[in-house]
């Protein structure tokens, strides 16, 4: 199964993928991470992002999904994440309408490479961590979460792809997904 894990920052996507790989060693996850990409290219992200950074991220995520075409792959982020953050930048006037439309089309196109989307929503129980790559602004994180919900609802209506929402402890998330992939 080809799975993409999506959600706002500070929800535990990377931790979930690591936990999943421990339980399911037959799965792989692409080696080049989003965090490494941001550092390597000095990209502006979160509230500071713009078209240039989002274009680099979009291409890297597309390449990762296209190149990792095996049967058992789990992705830590995908073009849905890229679209959501681009859309939030669009709402702040940092991304053009043309760019956001192209991002949305590319996001929809990439769904053909996936069989399942795992959404980890924001939880009030999760401690917000601020670092170079995570924004601690609760209002921004809530906006990102709302945009994820909106686009996932649209995807669920338009595409035959399984969308799973996971919450709870690390162990509960793995247990819940295990029931759905076996």
Segments from the language model and where they lie:
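A glycine- and Lys/Arg-enriched "phosphate-lid" helix/loop adjacent to the NTP-binding pocket
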Residues: 90-153, 164-167
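Glycine-rich phosphate-binding loop used to anchor ATP phosphates in small-molecule kinases
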Residues: 52-112
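Short loop/turn segments at strand-loop or loop-helix junctions that form parts
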Residues: 32-33, 76-79, 118-124
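Walker A (P-loop) ATP-phosphate-binding motif of ABC ATPase nucleotide-binding domains
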Residues: 2
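The conserved Walker
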Residues: 9
């Amino acid at each position: 199964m080809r799975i993409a894990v999506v959600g706002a920052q500070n929800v535990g996507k990377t931790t979930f993928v690591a936990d999943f790989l421990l339980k399911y060693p037959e799965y792989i996850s692409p080696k080049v991470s989003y965090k490494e990409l941001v550092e390597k290219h000095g990209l502006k992200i979160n509230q500071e992002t713009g078209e240039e950074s989002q274009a680099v991220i979009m291409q890297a995520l597309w390449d990762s999904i296209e190149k990792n075409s095996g049967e058992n792959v789990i992705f830590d982020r995908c073009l849905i994440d890229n679209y959501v953050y681009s859309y939030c930048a669009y709402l702040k006037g940092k991304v053009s309408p043309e760019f956001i439309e192209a991002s949305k089309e590319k996001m929809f196109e990439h769904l053909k490479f996936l069989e399942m989307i795992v959404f980890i929503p924001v939880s009030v129980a999760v401690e917000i961590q601020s670092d170079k790559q995570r924004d601690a602004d609760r209002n921004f994180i809530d906006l990102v979460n709302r945009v994820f919900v909106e686009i996932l609802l649209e995807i669920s209506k338009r595409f035959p792809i399984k969308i799973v929402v996971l919450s709870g402890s690390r162990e509960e998330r793995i247990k819940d997904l295990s029931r759905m992939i076996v």
